[in-house]
Amino acid sequence: MDLFNYSRRETSEVNIGAVPLGGPNPIRIQSMTNTPTQDTEACVAQAKRIVDAGGEYVRLTTQGVKEAENLMNINIGLRSTGYMVPLVADVHFNPKVADVAAQYAEKVRINPGNYVDPGRTFKQLEYTDEEYAAELQKIRDRFVPFLNICKENHTAVRIGVNHGSLSDRIMSRYGDTPEGMVESCMEFLRICVDEKFTDVVISIKASNTVVMVKTVRLLVSVMEQEGMSFPLHLGVTEAGDGEDGRIKSALGIGALLADGLGDTIRVSLSEEPEAEIPVARKLVDYITSRRNHPYIPGMEAPDFNYLSPVRRKTRPVRNIGGDHLPVVLADRMDGRMETHPQFTPDYIYAGRALPEQTEPGVQYILDADVWKGEPDTWPAFNYAQLELMETCAAELKFLFTPYMALTREVVACLKQHPEAVVVSQSNHPNRVGEHRALAHQLTVEGLQNPVIFFQHYAEDTAEDLQIKAGADMGALIFDGLCDGIYLFNQGKLSHAVIDATAFGILQAGRIRTSKTEYISCPGCGRTLFNLQSTIARVKEATSHLKGLKIGIMGCIVNGPGEMADADYGYVGAGRGKISLYKQKECIEKNIPEEEAVEKLIELIKANGDYEEKTSSLSSPKEKEDK
């Protein structure tokens, strides 16, 4: 794979009704209903809204045979009114349901974690090699008849692995690792290959963007080693709602799309399903617009490991680089110095003059030719000011340069000035590739100067900025190249929105935490409580608990598994009933929905993690995710 130049991975074509996937086809957009699948009228109406918004596939939960059989009625309801969208059945726990669904849906999604293996209980299981082989044979014996039904009905299959629902068998042998997730998928793919069943799509998802990106990269590598080219379905599970859901999805999905991986995407938002479609479309269009871009002549650093990257080794300069958290730079050249009360930048670029009033705890950056060494200020140079940089005695300097200006003279200057922090600029259509090329070239040259990525936009809506900036920063963060972020926007957005987006990107990439994190699913027909209003109530009660991770899950499919990545969890347990978790341990079951948020707060308080709300505008508590 070329790290610096965009092209899509070549994949096999899969027929899904009249909307083929993979191969020469465009990246497809899809969503999932959250209405009860036995409610034909509600499902048809919601599916139409998804299609009208631009969705190309509609998935429905089929938790039982009755739901699977009702897909026929939903199909009739759609087709009789001119909606020919392929339907995808989502199956967990019961392979018999998959057999039935394959007769009515254009595609069936099965979950390797619970297709034959029992549901996850977090028990450590011991197998001899012979016993483990026998378990694999059980999968084959059950899976092959299902594939035969799919062949007879021209039904495609998605093998959909979720981080939150790996089986105890896989967990016991491989641990909670990307390798385990990949093997969970490959066990089923090998059977498909043996049976010459090729209408297969794969997904490996997690709410943890780092795990999701690393696992998909590894899966593609393993498939290539075994001669497979199945298309990929991308998504970040439980991404959440609003700003958080958009940034997290853009970061994870965008990082993979930027590397040419992915044939269909679903942006999982805890909102109405049709609201996911415009976000997904913007993300796909932004990435694919860089096709046939001018070539970037980059050189990969010799010690870089794409499948398991570590943070690039840099020399710390004050609080930038080394083991420090990535910093946030912000622009205030328009003279408006307001800051977000929760997300105050570490450095503010003021340009030609300091503001009359400065923000406590904030450092300021001035153009080098007007910098006079004022307290808490630092000079900024461009690549044409190397002589001025040589005569400057500041212990921290910022050098703004694009990759194509990284000449021998600039490299030589950086070797003489380890106190210089490089601010990488790019106006290239593939700015991810050019930023990568600069960071790799510094490493090739033996330089350990920290790198901050300057991203220039002209957006008028927060959503557009969140999608584009998230997609641009994803690969750079997951590659371990990011020592800081600088978002510059010439649209109508306030500085507060831009700053919040920058901090949100660092949190979504798990390299700097500055607020409460929510792991919330989008809901489906299994969800038996009002997910959106519940999320709003939980956020209202806990949004000030910075650094805490709270899971809000509609059902038990991924709920308990995702709790391993959360501090506390709120999981649907039945109609109007909720279970509460402390990490992956269920603390209290079957709480009435109307009491559950209050009980959650009591649980957080009992464990000493609750703080009363204050009106303080102090900087947020921060910690690094390990």
UniProtKB/Swiss-Prot annotation:
Its EC number is 1.17.7.3. The gene is ispG. GO terms for biological process: isopentenyl diphosphate biosynthetic process, methylerythritol 4-phosphate pathway; terpenoid biosynthetic process. It comes from Bacteroides fragilis (strain ATCC 25285 / DSM 2151 / CCUG 4856 / JCM 11019 / LMG 10263 / NCTC 9343 / Onslow / VPI 2553 / EN-2). HAMAP family: IspG (MF_00159). One of its GO terms (molecular function) is 4-hydroxy-3-methylbut-2-en-1-yl diphosphate synthase activity (ferredoxin). It catalyses: (2E)-4-hydroxy-3-methylbut-2-enyl diphosphate + oxidized [flavodoxin] + H2O + 2 H(+) = 2-C-methyl-D-erythritol 2,4-cyclic diphosphate + reduced [flavodoxin]. This is 4-hydroxy-3-methylbut-2-en-1-yl diphosphate synthase (flavodoxin). InterPro entries: Dihydropteroate_synth-like_sf (IPR011005), IspG_atypical (IPR017178), IspG_bac-typ (IPR004588), NO2/SO3_Rdtase_4Fe4S_sf (IPR045854). Binds 1 [4Fe-4S] cluster. Keywords: 4Fe-4S, Iron, Iron-sulfur, Isoprene biosynthesis, Metal-binding, Oxidoreductase. The keyword Iron-sulfur applies. Belongs to the IspG family. Pfam families: GcpE. The keyword Cell membrane does not apply. [4Fe-4S] cluster binds at residues 521, 524, 555, 562. Converts 2C-methyl-D-erythritol 2,4-cyclodiphosphate (ME-2,4cPP) into 1-hydroxy-2-methyl-2-(E)-butenyl 4-diphosphate.
